[in-house]
């Protein structure tokens, strides 16, 4: 059994994904150790990211003091998850992740994983895009990275035997300073509350996906 | 075995998630039927969305004619995936999804799944936010929804025995009109190329997640 599987309590993809629901009321007595939280973040961070820049940053909120501070930048509607969760992982977008773009891809080349021609193509195509990008594009790019890693964290939490809830009902101005991060570098994206469900969550339905799908002629 | 599991070729979460890599070269001879594509989209759409508004729209590109049209709005760097994939699912954000907000949540109440008090709280908290939202916020909100459903589609593709690649290297002005969608309503987010890998993809490494994690004091 691979190292990764040993960490998982539930390796059943269909159950983890299709029986996932947003839990907003957790058992407040359940603690999750920081080692396990860090492991879950690392597992979630196997998600893809634009140019493998991993434009995400995680702030864990898992003490009463941290929760009190954190709630200053959270909408009241989301207090139940924050109060009862074992931990919240807030995911912020890093709009300066491309500063190390050259190092990241030079290393891939030095490790012999891509050709010089491919390295030049990658550096020639995307690095100029990032170096000349508008703040809006860098926020958009980082928002995508943070959302895909957030989706994996929701699934990884279930695979570790917990439930979770993603929320963006926050104060977008206050959040980054509240977390002690640099507002010039980081943008707020979403919080993921993690813990053991204390009650059966609301099972929402979905539109028929066919009504949201076109086939390009 | 649940209905969902029957569709899956690979229900091993750890393998699907941790052994996933971005494939850019597919076997061009492999076809994926539209029924199976539609099923994969429906399975991916079990993803969460802000207020369950499902602010995503899917356009499938799976014929030579559609690919030729689609490539007019794709960066050359991503032509290999487009040319060789069995299909591309382009995910666009729906910035008008909240127009049906009241209907969505009234139905949840009429189905007896939430109390009147909860309905009033939901409608009172978020509907005004959406009705007064800036275009930027609606784009941000839809981008998150499209990214989480995109992440699930990457995993669902592997669970169906395929591989996939997410890309946003596109022409952001041209894409929506090229897909025949209303640019006043939809915003481009990402394409997901799906097929059978024709060669072993590049295995990228990740930063140590501990270096990207803080614990709020």
Curated annotation (Swiss-Prot), chains A, B:
Gene3D superfamilies: NADH Oxidase. GO terms for molecular function: nucleotide binding; oxidoreductase activity. It catalyses: 10-oxo-(11E)-octadecenoate + NADH + H(+) = 10-oxooctadecanoate + NAD(+). FMN binds at residues 20, 22, 24, 78, 81, 165, 168-169, 206. Changing residue 101 to F: 5% of wild-type catalytic activity. Keywords: Detoxification, Flavoprotein, FMN, NAD, Nucleotide-binding, Oxidoreductase. Its cofactor is FMN. Pfam families: Nitroreductase. 10-oxooctadecanoate binds at residues 51, 118. Pathway: Lipid metabolism; fatty acid metabolism. PANTHER family: NAD(P)H NITROREDUCTASE YDGI-RELATED (PTHR43673), NADH DEHYDROGENASE_NAD(P)H NITROREDUCTASE XCC3605-RELATED (PTHR43673:SF10). Belongs to the nitroreductase family. Homodimer. This is CLA biosynthesis enone reductase. It comes from Lactiplantibacillus plantarum.
């Amino acid at each position: 059994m691979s190292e990764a599987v040993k960490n998982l309590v539930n390796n059943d993809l269909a159950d983890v994904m299709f029986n996932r629901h947003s839990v907003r009321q957790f058992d407040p007595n359940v603690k999750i150790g920081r080692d396990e939280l860090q492991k879950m973040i690392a597992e979630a961070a196997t998600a893809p990211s634009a140019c493998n820049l991993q434009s995400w940053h995680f702030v864990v909120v898992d003490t009463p003091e941290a929760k009190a501070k954190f709630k200053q930048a959270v909408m009241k509607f989301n207090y139940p998850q924050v109060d009862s969760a074992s931990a919240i992982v807030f995911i912020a977008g890093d709009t300066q992740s491309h500063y190390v773009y050259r190092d990241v891809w030079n290393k891939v080349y030095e490790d012999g994983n891509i050709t010089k021609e491919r390295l030049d193509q990658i550096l020639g195509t995307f690095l100029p895009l990032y170096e000349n990008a508008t703040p809006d594009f860098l926020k958009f790019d980082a928002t995508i990275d943070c959302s895909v890693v957030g989706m994996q964290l929701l699934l990884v939490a279930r695979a570790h035997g917990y439930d979770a809830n993603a929320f963006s009902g926050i104060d977008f101005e206050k959040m980054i300073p509240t977390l002690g991060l640099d507002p010039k570098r980081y943008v707020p994206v979403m919080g993921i509350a993690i813990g053991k469900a204390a009650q059966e969550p609301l099972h929402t339905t979905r539109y028929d996906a066919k009504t949201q799908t076109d086939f390009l002629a």
